[in-house]
Amino acid sequence: MALYVSMVWRKILRKRWVLGVVFGLSLIYFLTSTFKQEERTVRDRMLLQTGDQDQNLQWKVQFNLGNSSRISNQCRNSVQGKLLVTDDMGYICERKELLANGCCNINVASTKLYSCETCLPNGCCSVYEFCVSCCLQPNKQLQLERFLNKAAVAFQNLFQAVEDHFELCLAKCRTSSQSVQHENTYRNPIAKHCYGESPPELLPI
């Protein structure tokens, strides 16, 4: 039975119109996928354009008040870094110095609090973990609130899951279409992680 089915399929596939249909369907699928991807890219770029008028919307973001705000001995952290990790209190440390509770070991000399190393004055950094740590500084609250007020409507879908200062910094420091100059080129390939209101400075190409 299997041999018979195999022979029938081979005969069908030898017919040119069958191959034409298969090719046509493949082409339609490819074009549809390409257009959808382009549509998503354009939509993201439009969302990341900051509005000109302040929006007085209520946000769930709660800002750190320093070490006293810790209510448990557990920490969330930036997770993804191979070499560095930033916890939700603003400490940045080497991954090997991360404790079992998710917090950086503050008794190690290399662990730093609210470090802006690799960051430029405009709030763009070359290392993601330093961007998050710098963004968590309490004195960045006004800057972040200003960004949220201006971008609240455009970012309501992108930031709907953000609940506090740490999650906001994680999301803000990720590279986005704001960091892109052309399709595959960063505006500033050195400092592409930004917590500030403005995108990276445009470098000549």
From Swiss-Prot:
Keyword line: Glycoprotein, Golgi apparatus, Membrane, Transmembrane, Transmembrane helix
Entry's transmembrane regions: 17-35
GO cellular component terms given for this protein: Golgi membrane
Matching InterPro entries: SPRING1
Disulfide partners: none
Glycosylation site residues: N67
Membrane topology type: Single-pass membrane protein
GO biological process: positive regulation of SREBP signaling pathway
Cytoplasmic side stretches: 1-16
Regions of this protein lying in the Lumenal compartment: 36-205
Chief localisation class: Golgi
UniProt KW Transmembrane helix keyword: yes
Localization terms from the record: Golgi apparatus membrane
Purpose: Positively regulates hepatic SREBP signaling pathway by modulating the proper localization of SCAP (SREBP cleavage-activating protein) to the endoplasmic reticulum, thereby controlling the level of functional SCAP.
Family: Belongs to the SPRING family.
Name of the protein in its database record: SREBP regulating gene protein
Organism: Xenopus laevis
